[in-house]
Amino acid sequence: MSSSANETLRGFYVEYRQQLYTYAVSITRHREAAEDAIHHVFQQLLRRGNLPADLRPYIFMCVRNAALDTLRRAKTRGDSIFDETTELGAQDAGSNVPLSVDELNQWLERLSQDERETIVLKIFDSFSFQEVADLRRVPLSTATSWYRRGLAKLRTIVAEENL
């Protein structure tokens, strides 16, 4: 891989690492699995050599596929490859993670995979509805429906929690 492509990837990672991580965690629901998926994608891209012109949707698609592959491999083995402490919502000992972050994670867990992914991409990763639809390979109307349905469920969940 050329040094300019290497620098391009490095710059992309620095700019989007948190968004990629948030997206991968929304799929895997496990921190280490999300990190592994992202690591795998960037290793593959570094080996590949040529990069597409529009990196953002391409790399998010690669991370999605790697995260889903991680889930499939775990399911095929029929065992849990994750330690209880790595699951979303579990705090590390001595962690100062605000309760609201844990609450948000718990609320997102109650949505379908499609709704959760769409909301994370739209709100946290600033994807347009068209970008979400392209990434997920679904019609635009499907992506917007997942988003609206997910937000409606979140409003209901928040209202129930605040009673």
Protein language model annotation of sequence segments:
Residues 1-22, 32-35, 50, 116:
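A short, charge-rich alpha-helical start-of-domain segment used by transcription regulators
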Residues 22, 36-43, 53-65:
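Structural recognition of an alpha-helix C-terminal capping motif at a helix-to-coil junction
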